[in-house]
């Protein structure tokens, strides 16, 4: 098992050579989530010939930008460190790959859905999930 394999693995490694490999991540594109579909469709409308999709670092960056946006909104546009730090506490978004995310108040850490996926023929089949896992609960 590995904690960071995503669908981009199959661009570099034939899926049959890693059949059955398990991974635990915050998103797989096989998840039937409305926002995932919206983002996937927008990406492939623009980059139809791409063999790669944005992997886990990109989804984390997306989530971070969405949470930052919510902090800016909550601070009424005050970009001072103090105002943004206060506004980030408890910030949340539903517009993130893999589902919602929230900064746990008082911690500065993000909680989000987590999924265990197993490669079945070049797709990570989600075999287990946990909603809104706080940081540090996975290991």
What positions do the PLM features span?
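Extracytosolic ligand-binding ectodomains
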Residues: 1-139
């Amino acid at each position: 098992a590995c904690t960071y394999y995503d669908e981009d693995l199959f661009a570099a490694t034939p899926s049959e050579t890693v059949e059955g490999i398990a991974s635990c991540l915050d998103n797989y594109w096989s998840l039937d989530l409305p926002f995932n579909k919206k983002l996937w469709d927008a990406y492939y409308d623009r980059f139809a010939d791409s063999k790669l999709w944005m992997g886990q670092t990109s989804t984390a960056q997306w989530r971070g930008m969405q949470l930052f946006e919510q902090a800016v909104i909550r601070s009424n546009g005050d970009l001072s460190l103090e105002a943004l730090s206060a506004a980030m506490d408890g910030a949340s978004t539903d517009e993130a790959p893999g589902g919602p995310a929230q900064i746990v108040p008082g911690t500065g850490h993000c909680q989000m859905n987590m999924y265990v996926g197993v490669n079945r023929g070049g797709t990570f089949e989600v075999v287990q999930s946990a909603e809104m896992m706080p940081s540090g609960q996975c290991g």
